[in-house]
């Protein structure tokens, strides 16, 4: 890696950690808060230095557009963790009946998350709130998200709304607008201009801890 000052290294590590854990890049305000900086100008300065050294790339026309460029051979922590989970097998002991009992399997197989995710780039997010409860996705659940930047109408996606936070909703395109539809009769859909929404991924599975 190119030579960095201590502060540049700290900011680069923060950006890597934030992006790995959230699945999207931080805003300048979040960087300032996370780094304990009182001035956004200082954030801009360090981001500019990291960009000039080839460690970041930005799209100046989009919010949260910082892309961390990693040295060859350096795997994202989230991807490394996902790979470890995907190869960790769990014993599959057979089916369980909700009606009459069924025969147990004497020679259990092994199932890994890789059987479900395949070669996709997948990350995990924990759900906060009840907006998707009618899809049986509730507060505290974990969703498996395939990292993509486009999705078909009706798919459950992780969407980043400009000047706002990420949200988990079904996506529908309606002309020049996008409708982010909750699955909760008590909540209203979010309608925003199409250009202000970025798809971060689509949900491919749900995990629940009892």
Curated annotation (Swiss-Prot):
Keyword DNA-binding tagged: yes
Protein name in the entry: LexA repressor
EC number assigned by the record: 3.4.21.88
PANTHER family: LEXA REPRESSOR, LEXA REPRESSOR-RELATED
InterPro entries, per the entry: LexA, LexA-like, LexA/Signal_pep-like_sf, LexA_DNA-bd_dom, LexA_repressor, Peptidase_S24_LexA, Peptidase_S24_S26A/B/C, WH-like_DNA-bd_sf
This protein's record includes keyword Zinc: no
Site feature Cleavage, where: 98-99
Location of the active site: 131 (for autocatalytic cleavage activity), 169 (for autocatalytic cleavage activity)
Top-level taxon: Bacteria
TM region(s), chain numbering: none
Function: Represses a number of genes involved in the response to DNA damage (SOS response), including recA and lexA. In the presence of single-stranded DNA, RecA interacts with LexA causing an autocatalytic cleavage which disrupts the DNA-binding part of LexA, leading to derepression of the SOS regulon and eventually DNA repair.
Protein family membership: Belongs to the peptidase S24 family.
Enzyme type, top EC level: hydrolase
Catalytic activity: Hydrolysis of Ala-|-Gly bond in repressor LexA
GO molecular-function term, one example from the UniProt record: serine-type endopeptidase activity
Assigned keywords, A-Z: Autocatalytic cleavage, DNA damage, DNA repair, DNA replication, DNA-binding, Hydrolase, Repressor, SOS response, Transcription, Transcription regulation
Entry-linked NCBIfam families: lexA (TIGR00498)
Subunit structure of this chain's protein: Homodimer.
Chain residues forming the annotated DNA-binding region: 28-48
């Amino acid at each position: 890696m190119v030579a960095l000052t201590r502060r540049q290294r700290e900011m680069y590590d923060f950006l890597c950690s934030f992006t790995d854990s959230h699945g999207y890049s931080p805003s300048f305000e979040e960087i300032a808060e996370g780094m304990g900086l009182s001035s956004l100008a200082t954030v801009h300065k360090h981001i500019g230095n990291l960009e000039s050294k080839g460690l970041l790339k930005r799209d100046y026309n989009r919010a949260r557009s910082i892309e961390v460029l990693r040295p060859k051979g350096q795997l994202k922590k989230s991807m490394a963790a996902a790979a470890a989970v995907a190869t960790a097998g769990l014993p599959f002991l057979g089916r369980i009946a909700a009606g009459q009992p069924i025969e147990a399997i004497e020679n259990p197989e092994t199932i890994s998350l890789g059987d479900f995710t395949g070669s996709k780039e997948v990350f995990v997010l924990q759900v906060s709130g009840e907006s998707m409860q009618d899809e049986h996705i509730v507060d505290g659940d974990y969703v498996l998200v395939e990292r993509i930047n486009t999705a078909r109408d009706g798919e459950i996606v992780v969407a980043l709304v400009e000047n706002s936070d990420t949200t988990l909703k079904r996506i529908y395109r309606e002309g020049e607008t996008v409708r982010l539809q909750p699955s909760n009769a008590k909540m209203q859909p979010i309608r925003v201009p199409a250009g202000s929404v970025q798809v971060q991924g689509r949900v491919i599975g749900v995990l629940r801890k009892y």
